Amino acid sequence: MKIVYDRINNMRGNLITITAEGVSLGELARIDLKDGRNIYASVLRIDGDQVTLQVFQTTRGISTSDQVTFLNRQMQAVYGDTLLGRRLSGTGLPIDGGPQVIGESIDIGSTSFNPVKRIVPRDMVRTNIPMIDVFNCLVKSQKIPIFSVPGEPYNALLMRIANQTDADVVIIGGMGLTFKEYQAFIENAETAGTINKTVMFIHRATDPAVECLLVPDMALACAERFATDGKNVLVLLTDMTAFADAIKEIAITMDQVPSNRGYPGSLYSDLASRYEKAVSIEDSGSITVIGVTTMPGDDVTHPVPDNTGYITEGQFYLHHGKIDPFGSLSRLKQLVIGKVTRDDHGDLANAMIRLYAESKKARERQAMGFKLSKWDEKLLTYSHLFEERMMNLEVNYTLEEALDLGWETLAECFLASEVGIKESVISKYWPEIAQISK
């Protein structure tokens, strides 16, 4: 039997407080309004018999005499094949004008996957973006952020990854999206023809902050079920800074003592519990997580990117519309380079980055008016070709095509003896291009 409480003691923002007993943290409750509407909330804090709930929509229209019924279960998402191609809110309700999703109800916010059933990552997630596939490979079950400043095309990068990836299912979790950004994701999926393998959980900027907190949990709960059913799932989250700001907003409303720049002390755990859902499951599928983290003022010491860096396995830095090869790092790339990719992959990638770093110095000498040597001229030519062919996010090359293009670029600019690659690799892969004016 469910006990009905008919007295709300306090309302602050999206939080309400009632006197109740026998409830658990995270338990779902239904608020029955006088006008016949039902609003849902979940238990956020328990202090003796004082229970604080966060309302998923808005407290507007709620009176202190409305009835509150605890449902003896956690917040749930609906999982099933009918989920593919759908757009849902942070609470799991359809926002695409379609019918209710039919399927199995699954709890959200559960613990990470059983470590005993995890396996060491050994497969690559292909994105057909050279700056990722060639230089910082994305590995199945990897968790990695995209560090960026507001205004950079990070959502466009996520869309291109979603379009070009070889993952079986793509789940997009949008937090704090403007209407324009939301529409861009919809139009991209429809235009690229990936809508039938895509699921979107969307929190728009005008939606309550409480719903923002649910988006990653909804996305990752469904991803976990797809993965246990043998699917390789790619989860794209944007923007985790908006998620952290929603946590801060709720914490301030609850009068919690802030830890760093207004964020609560639980920020690290809140982020880690989401990113740790990334997994490769033995004899089954995988979950790979890419999360956009915007850095206010391009400050990497901001609490959100700072904490994220300790949790994740590398990062992609997005600067001036390109993935920065010097700030970006994939800590798992050594698990696949030369093992599941071509044997020239590691040598070629290292040589190209080293020469591009040297070309930066040549550009500085050119900018300061120094006389340039013939080697400097070669480096400047190479720098232009590298940025045009490898750093352009609009390209769509398979890994093998990108590696071949890398060899062609080196051969157009340098002699084989100048690139610093061992002779056994050079003799096998150096293209037959006439050595003119080198």
UniProtKB/Swiss-Prot annotation:
The keyword Thylakoid does not apply. SUPFAM superfamilies: P-loop containing nucleoside triphosphate hydrolases. Keywords: ATP synthesis, Hydrogen ion transport, Ion transport, Transport. GO terms for biological process: proton motive force-driven plasma membrane ATP synthesis. One of its GO terms (molecular function) is ATP binding. Produces ATP from ADP in the presence of a proton gradient across the membrane. The V-type beta chain is a regulatory subunit. Belongs to the ATPase alpha/beta chains family. This is V-type ATP synthase beta chain. The gene is atpB.
